[in-house]
A protein has these predicted regions:
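N-terminal ligand-binding/catalytic initiation module
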Residues: 1-155, 375, 381, 385-389
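Short, ordered loop/turn segments at secondary-structure junctions
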Residues: 69-71, 79, 108-109, 134-137, ...
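General beta-strand structural signal in soluble alpha/beta enzymes
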Residues: 105, 131-134, 155-158, 189, ...
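Rossmann-like adenosine-cofactor binding region
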Residues: 232-301, 307-309
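Glycine-rich phosphate/diphosphate-binding loop of Rossmann-like nucleotide-binding domains
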Residues: 74, 81-99, 157, 161, ...
């Protein structure tokens, strides 16, 4: 199917994908006086006396801001705030469809870190959570870090953490299938940007001890001068053997390849140099680092991509609806690392041992069990950690 043409027609026909819908009817004078003036003054007074009452009397508790500056949109790059709108609308649509979370796109006409932080802080009283989206690295790290420190609502950069959570969920099951342990496998992550770094961090929390990050210029190593601050910090805690060189060398002998990089950078011959029962997660979109049939030709046993037309789709839609549903229902002040681990385990657990096979290591995007399971795990974790207010 020609999805480009169909998408253009959809967006033109509907003038976007989302709209504001009323929860109550205003059909007569009494309705008007209750929904607006004079009756509306009473909830205003209650909230003025106790700001936490805003969760009781307004939509804040189920409302998420989808914030972008349009600098890292899909594979399109820095296309600006207006051109980012269809993606942010799409994100809001998925929030609603998969977890009944109301979300609103906010595309900012600035690339300045301080301006973005200040703007989101000004908007925060309206929202129960903030989903950062398609903001380029390394600025995205500072923006998220500061907002998490300065706001008392969940802030979540989905390009980092959503990707990391679903990768970890898939890898937990893939390793179970091939009979290998997280602490023992050798992992190469191609793409040392926001997603690759976040994947590495979460894998380490799951016990991974042997990770090498690779970027365009080669392995991320403490001896390299080209590293940005985020990459340099990762060099200190990964690549313990101080491997150097291009991906073609680094991939040799590895048990796991995780790609969040560019199309067609891996060949069947490269996969053939990996360890036996190799696991290949090639997630570049729309064209992966290696097509599944080529990875299989190279000897990979478990293969996943970011595409819906192949088995084992590694898709963030398995994560962000449920993680925000749980955080909002708990009225959490933040999304902690432990909540991310809980989300990954919940996704992995959807696939039972009896169901687990090479072409089914992760639930499908439309599996209705996923969002509720993630939400419950996240909510339970928030309460156990003392970051819940509900």
């Amino acid at each position: 199917m020609d999805y480009n043409r169909l998408s253009l027609e959809m967006h033109e026909t509907h003038h976007g994908k989302i709209a504001v819908a009323p929860k109550v009817k205003v059909e007569n004078r009494d309705d008007l006086s209750t929904a607006y003036t004079p009756g509306v003054a009473e909830p205003c007074r209650r909230i003025a006396a106790d700001k936490q009452e805003v969760y009781r009397y307004t939509a804040k508790g189920n409302l998420v801001a989808v914030v972008s500056d349009g600098t890292a949109v899909l594979g399109l790059g820095d296309i600006g705030p207006e051109a980012a709108m269809p993606v942010m609308e799409g994100k809001a649509l998925l929030f609603k469809e998969f977890a009944d979370v109301d979300a609103f796109p906010i595309c900012l006409d600035t690339k300045d870190v301080e301006e973005i932080i200040r703007t989101v802080k000004f908007l925060a009283p309206t929202f129960g959570g903030v989903n950062l989206e398609d903001i380029s690295a390394p600025r995205c790290f500072e923006i998220e870090k500061r907002l998490k420190e300065e706001l008392d609502i969940p802030v979540f950069h989905d390009d980092q953490h959503g990707t990391a959570i679903v990768v970890c969920a898939g890898l937990l099951n893939a390793l179970k299938l091939v009979g290998k342990q997280m602490a023992e496998v050798n992992i190469v992550i191609n793409g040392a940007g926001s997603a690759g770094i976040s994947i590495a961090k979460l894998l380490m929390r799951f016990g991974a001890g042997n990770i090498v990050l690779v970027d365009r210029q080669g392995a991320v190593s403490v001896d390299e001068s080209w590293l940005n601050p985020a990459q340099r910090a990762m060099a200190e805690v990964t690549n313990k053997q101080n491997e150097r060189g291009p991906l073609t060398e680094i991939i040799k002998g590895k048990d796991v390849f995780i790609g969040v990089s560019a199309p067609k950078v891996v060949t069947a011959e490269m996969v053939s140099t990996m360890a036996s029962d190799a696991i290949v997660f090639a997630m570049a979109n729309p064209t992966p680092e290696i097509m599944p049939e080529e990875a299989a030709k190279g000897g990979a046993r478990v293969i996943a991509t970011g595409r819906s037309d192949h088995p084992n789709q590694i898709n963030n839609v398995l994560v962000f609806p449920g993680i925000f549903r749980g955080a909002l229902d708990a009225r959490a002040t933040e999304i902690t690392e432990e909540m991310k681990l809980a989300a990954a385990r919940a996704i992995a657990a959807i696939v039972t041992d009896e169901e687990l096979r090479e072409d089914y290591i992760i639930p499908g995007a439309f599996d209705k069990r996923v969002a509720p399971a993630v939400a419950q795990a996240v909510m339970d974790c928030a309460k156990a950690q003392g970051v819940a207010r509900a």
